[in-house]
Amino acid sequence: MTLGQFGGLFCIYLIAVIFILTLTYQEFRRVKFNFNVLFSMLYLLTFYFGFPLTCMLVFQFGVAVVPVEYLLYAMLSATAFYGIYYVTYKTRLRQPRSQPRTPIFTMNRVETNLTWVLLALVAVGTVGIFFMQNGFLLFKLDSYSKIFSSDVSGVALKRFFYFFIPAMLVVYFLKQDMRAWFFFLASTVAFGILTYVIVGGTRANIIIAFSLFLFIGIVRGWITLWMLAAAGVFGIVGMFWLALKRYGLDVNGAEAFYTFLYLTRDTFSPWENLGLLLQNYDKIDFQGLAPIVRDFYVFIPSALWPERPDLVLNTANYFTWDVLDNHSGLAISPTLIGSLVVMGGVLFIPLGAIVVGLIIKWFDWLYEQGKAESNRYKAAILQSFCFGAVFNIIVLAREGLDSFVSRVVFFCVIFGACLVLAKLLYWLFDTAGLIKRQGIKSNRLSMPNAGNQL
């Protein structure tokens, strides 16, 4: 990359960042927090945060990067995608209802507490099983890629660990005070550190817990933008330190700065991967919607499907194995736009932007229903479900649409199963006479009124 090429890219970069930041800041001033603001921040992080880091790696350390024209294509496609997404998100599909909806379900205190206990048991129970099978992998494995090897059993159980976070979200939303806020941080980060040590370097639970703590603080007005920026810097440094421990790196001086740049870029902003994918566009055999279906394979026990493929060919694995011919053991993230390109080429980019706009619009609708709900127990469940889906939104921006669909369906199934089981247990306890009638009566006083939307 020459200085002239850098100047051209920087102009496009500046226009794109100002465009997205302006729209995001306007939305932030209007509502403080919604899923459009969240997705926009994650989108900026994924596709634009890495550009300065890439430039420092090129000019400070002489690192070879994807040819500039493909980086330009990546930047232009990301900007066009966001524009189409934003128009779709802001388009009103139907007029507001003048008549209230009939509530689909309601909640009481016992059912709500049973729900979060069941969610926590799912997480703690699967962590315990994984630990009994593998021990503390952080101290047993000599490389992070071995987490995905046959030496590690019960890998599918890792999908359940995350449900500790929505469980603690229910606890927070039942109280919604500063003490509950800090309890959420302490409990979820402690659990995240435990899973980091047991799994051998997976940082997702820690990142999500800290991020949700900040988002809640913004919604409640307990955190300012300056505090958020400082927390972001702290989070980046913390993730870098955890990455060093995960990969067993011991660096200092210029090497430490170089390692910080490329690990931070690869962790938070794998935007160069999109340029690399576009560079190899002619090698892609478009997969259609098959990667979405294949990503569900990991949820099917081998006992039910003995011939189940051990390796799932989703867009990330297809990009890594078939396009790049990389078999190092780690999948290279294609990003949201890259996953669309793998599935259907550049024509899937605007179609994907429309789909993502509708997805984020639905999450915001559900979140607003939770905030407007008069039954505080049902409100806690709805808001916990929405905030609990933040991890899936991160997966959407960073990993791709196929990974998002499988994870959000899995999240809905497990969350819904715990909710239904909680209601069943309440019915059994009530039938057995274990529920005090006074508690039921007081709960009925807080049942939703005719203005409820769910």
Curated annotation (Swiss-Prot):
Pathway entry: Bacterial outer membrane biogenesis; enterobacterial common antigen biosynthesis
Gene Ontology CC: one annotated term: plasma membrane
Top-level taxon of origin: Bacteria
Transmembrane region(s): 3-23, 39-59, 61-81, 119-139, 154-174, 180-200, 201-221, 222-242, 340-360, 377-397, 409-429
GO BP: any one term: enterobacterial common antigen biosynthetic process
Main subcellular location: membrane
Family as reported in the entry's similarity comment: Belongs to the WzyE family.
Subunit structure, interactors included: Probably part of a complex composed of WzxE, WzyE and WzzE.
Protein name as annotated: Probable ECA polymerase
